[in-house]
Swiss-Prot record:
BP GO terms, sorted: abscisic acid-activated signaling pathway; defense response
Protein name: Major pollen allergen Bet v 1-D/H
Family, similarity comment: Belongs to the BetVI family.
PANTHER family on file: OS08G0374000 PROTEIN-RELATED (PTHR31213), STRESS-INDUCED PROTEIN SAM22 (PTHR31213:SF55)
GO cellular component, as recorded: cytoplasm; nucleus
Keywords carried by this UniProt record: Allergen, Cytoplasm, Pathogenesis-related protein, Plant defense
Subcellular location: Cytoplasm
Keyword Cytoplasm found: yes
Keyword Cytoplasm attributed: yes
Function statement: May be a general steroid carrier protein.
Lineage: Eukaryota, Viridiplantae, Streptophyta, Embryophyta, Tracheophyta
Major site of localization recorded for this protein: cytoplasm
Gene3D superfamilies: 3.30.530.20
Gene from which this protein is expressed: BETV1D
Annotated source species: Betula pendula
Binding site for brassinolide: 55, 82, 84, 101
Length: 160
C-alpha cells in the first residue's frame, strides 16, 4: 500500500466559526440545497455526527459515481477541524483503500478565513493516483465551498 498526499489552501470572506457551522456541522443539510448539481443528498447511516459516524453522500444523475460513504474521524469544535475518510464508493475500490481528509478552518485578521485541506489517498498495491482524480476532488471542494459561501453572503442571519 502506498500513500499519496496533497494539500491545498483556499480563502473565504466568511468568518471561520460561521463557515465551520454551515459547511462542516450542517453541511449534510445545507450543501444539497445550495449545490444540488454536485450532491443530491446525504444520508446518516449510523452515529450522531461525531467520530465513527457513517454517512452516504449521493450524487446526481450523470455524475461519474453514484455515491461515496464517509466515516467521520474527528470533529474539533474549538479548533474548527474536521477529519473524515472516504471508505466506500466513488473512486474507492480496486485501486484505492480509502481517502483520508483533514479540513482545518483558520481565522484571518481581515475577518475571513483560510481552509487548509489535506487529502491522503491510500492506494492498494502499486497503484498510483491519477492526476484527474486529484483535479476532480479539488474542483468539487471548491464548488461546494463557493456555493456555501454564496449562500452565507446572501443570508447574513444564517449560522451566526
Amino acid at each position: 500500500m502506498g500513500v499519496f498526499n496533497y494539500e491545498i489552501e483556499t480563502t473565504s470572506v466568511i468568518p471561520a466559526a460561521r463557515l465551520f457551522k454551515a459547511f462542516i456541522l450542517d453541511g449534510d443539510n445545507l450543501v444539497p440545497k445550495v449545490a444540488p448539481q454536485a450532491i443530491s443528498s446525504v444520508e446518516n447511516i449510523e452515529g450522531n455526527g461525531g467520530p465513527g459516524t457513517i454517512k452516504k453522500i449521493n450524487f446526481p444523475e450523470g455524475f461519474p459515481f453514484k455515491y461515496v460513504k464517509d466515516r467521520v474521524d474527528e470533529v474539533d469544535h474549538t479548533n474548527f477541524k474536521y477529519n473524515y475518510s472516504v471508505i466506500e464508493g466513488g473512486p474507492v475500490g480496486d485501486t484505492l483503500e480509502k481517502i483520508s481528509n483533514e479540513i482545518k478552518i483558520v481565522a484571518t485578521p481581515d475577518g475571513g478565513c483560510v481552509l487548509k485541506i489535506s487529502n491522503k489517498y491510500h492506494t492498494k498495491g502499486n497503484h498510483e493516483v491519477k492526476a484527474e482524480q486529484v483535479k476532480a476532488s479539488k474542483e468539487m471542494g471548491e464548488t461546494l465551498l463557493r456555493a456555501v459561501e454564496s449562500y452565507l453572503l446572501a443570508h447574513s442571519d444564517a449560522y451566526n
